Amino acid sequence: RGAHQIQDEEVNELPGTYGDPAKAIENFPGMGRVLLSQGSLFVRGALPNESAVFVDDYEIPDLYHFTGSTSVINAPFVESVELVPGGFSARYGRSTGGVVTIKTKKLPTDDVHGFAKLDLIDAGAYAGVPLSDDIAMGASARRSYLDAVRNIQRANGGTGDAVLLVPTYWDYQLKLDWDTAPGHELVVFAFGSGDREEYIADGSGALDPYLRTNDSDFHRLSLRYQHNVGSGFTHTF
């Protein structure tokens, strides 16, 4: 079926990913680069609505934020990313372009893990905490701050009569892994994302009526129970 997969440990070896596993699929054959103001996929020349994205078998509307600079799932939660450009299972719906599946990572129970980051576009943080030898919880949040910088600039005189596009995005993830018994695992995963693009005019600048604000957001809550029956077979509910 011509599937292409990448594991999280391979990401740092690929150019242009900036440590984001989902950005790696742009290097796969048949993939088009994400355009500014679109977080959608371009697989083998198909329209974005002809492809689909799934996180742990739950479909989401977009893989990337509108800026195209980052995906909607933070890297610490990603175990693997797979692109299937054709011949995929009917359980993925009526997509004709391609399917991207993201598998989330089992949280470690050995120690506390975490980080915080700040760059030119956004700020975010992640923390993973073991609650016991069998239970671990992880949480992450990220938000861009270009709109805040823009507000400060406007408060100090703005940029004359300029009309500028100001993108804003955010996302969050909250995950609980519980090994209820040997070979049995309960996973609760809540995640969501939001994007907003707004045109702002300073001074006497007038907005073109065709320049409209663009909003998009989604939220998902998944509950999964998995039983490893042996010989490589599992039951998932």
PLM ranges: what are they?
Residues G68, R150-N156, A190-S193, E198-L207:
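Outer-membrane beta-barrel translocator domains and adjoining extracellular loop/strand segments
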Residues D119-R143, G160-R196, T213-T234:
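Transmembrane beta-barrel wall of Gram-negative outer-membrane proteins
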Residues P48, Y58-I60, K105, I121, ...:
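Structural signature of outer-membrane beta-barrel domains
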Residues R1-S89, V99, K103-K106:
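Periplasmic N-terminal accessory/gating domains of Gram-negative outer-membrane beta-barrel systems
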Residues G68-S71, E79-S89, G98-V129, A139-R143, ...:
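Short strand-turn segments of transmembrane beta-barrel domains in outer membranes
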Residues D20, E26, Q38, G68, ...:
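Transmembrane beta-barrel architecture of outer-membrane proteins
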Residues G93, G97, D111-F115, A136, ...:
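Outer-membrane beta-barrel architecture
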Residues H65, D111-H113, N156-V163, G205-R212, ...:
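Extracellular loop and loop/strand-boundary signature of outer-membrane beta-barrel proteins
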